[in-house]
């Protein structure tokens, strides 16, 4: 057996080859992350006269840079193993000189495979991979929305602090129409009342009319906001409001694409209380093949909601926190699902209340509910059966 350890980088990879005894067969060499580099990799193996059916390739899951080489090797029939960088670091700690260089890392990656104590990262099926990219992209855009909203609020707090009292939701369609047209007290108070009333009536679908227009102009005339740099504040608020509209359209487009993929999967995950199509997509795309996990505890560790253990001698930690070492996207989705389920699912609601009655804070109680939610998700995905809520006679701790 020959192991090709590859240290992945953006433009240039480093590779080295060892045999089953750990003897270096090919010293570390570099090759570019393109077709000519790939050909150089194969040429180096051919030069060493290595039988390709006895060669195994190993690489770290470094960002997204490993995907192109991984898929090319797999397509051509090679055995490829992908490991977590944490596992390479654990091997490095055994060496007295814990140097980190690309050539040395290529050898370390090969050694990890030779020792056999590793868990492989896998490339999900294409539809799951597409779903994951969409969900992560959606998460990024929603984060942008939150950031832009904070900027709008900060500007309005300075120039028009009374504005937030006019709407239950400052970012409703009606409010956004006003922020894109007349966002400052001066512009709002000087706008003809009839024009303002028409704008409000159209944007609110006739929910608001003259009374809301009069209320807004009264607030504008009596505003205690910062009077300087009005043109700049107006420009910034208008631009941010238009940016929010654009981001909102992008989220809708992503949601449509996510829904299309979810329809093809025919999954029972959305039968779980607290998990709708969007959260279900996040969870499915991050987990992938549930058979990768032998237990719900392994899935909890992957999500990073397993408790950290603190033990030394006779000491056992009693205030253990979430490890938060797994997928942040999966952890966030499970947290949202559990937060909803403790309000609507009979068993989780009772379990959550039990933890609250024990004196645990709200967030800690939701954390316990998250671990129960993981068990439910694991069982539903493992058995591929719809979830049936129930109230147990006794709720286990």
What are these regions (language model features)?
Residues 1-397:
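A detector of single, family-specific signature residues
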């Amino acid at each position: 057996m020959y192991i090709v350890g590859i240290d992945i980088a953006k433009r240039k990879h480093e590779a080295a080859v060892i045999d089953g005894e750990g003897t270096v067969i090919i010293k570390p060499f570099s090759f570019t992350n393109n077709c000519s580099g790939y050909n150089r990799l194969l040429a180096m193996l051919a030069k060493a006269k290595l039988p390709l059916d006895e060669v195994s390739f190993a690489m770290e899951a470094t960002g997204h840079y490993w995907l192109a080489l991984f898929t090319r090797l797999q397509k051509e029939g090679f055995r490829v193993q992908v490991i977590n960088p944490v596992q390479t670091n654990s091997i490095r700690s055994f060496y007295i000189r814990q140097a980190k260089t690309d050539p040395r890392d290529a050898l370390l990656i090969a050694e990890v495979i030779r020792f056999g104590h590793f868990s492989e990262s896998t490339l999900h099926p294409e539809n799951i991979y597409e779903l994951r990219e969409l969900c992560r992209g959606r998460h990024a855009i929603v984060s942008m929305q939150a950031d832009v909203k904070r900027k709008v609020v900060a500007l309005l707090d300075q120039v028009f602090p009374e504005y937030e009292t006019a709407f239950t939701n400052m970012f409703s369609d009606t409010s956004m129409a006003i922020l894109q047209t007349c966002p400052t007290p001066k512009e709002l108070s000087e706008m003809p009342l009839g024009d303002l009333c028409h704008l409000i009536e159209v944007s609110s679908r006739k929910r608001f009319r003259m009374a809301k227009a009069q209320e807004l102009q009264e607030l504008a005339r009596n505003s205690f906001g910062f009077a300087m740099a009005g043109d700049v504040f107006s420009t910034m608020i208008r631009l941010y409001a238009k940016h929010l509209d654009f981001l909102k359209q992008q989220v809708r487009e992503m949601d449509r694409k996510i829904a299309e993929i979810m329809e093809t999967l025919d999954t029972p995950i959305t039968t779980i209380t607290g998990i709708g199509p969007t959260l279900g997509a996040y969870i499915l795309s991050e987990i992938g093949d549930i058979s990768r996990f032998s237990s719900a505890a392994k899935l909890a560790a992957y999500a990073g909601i397993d408790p950290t253990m603190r033990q030394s001698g006779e000491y056992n930690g009693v205030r253990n926190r979430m490890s938060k070492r797994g997928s942040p996207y999966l952890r966030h989705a499970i947290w949202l699902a559990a937060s909803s389920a403790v309000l609507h699912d009979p068993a989780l609601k009772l379990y959550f209340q039990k933890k609250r009655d024990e004196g645990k804070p709200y967030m800690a109680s939701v954390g316990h509910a998250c671990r129960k939610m993981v068990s439910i998700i694991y069982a539903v995905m493992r058995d591929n059966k719809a979830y049936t809520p129930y109230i147990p006679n006794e709720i286990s701790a």
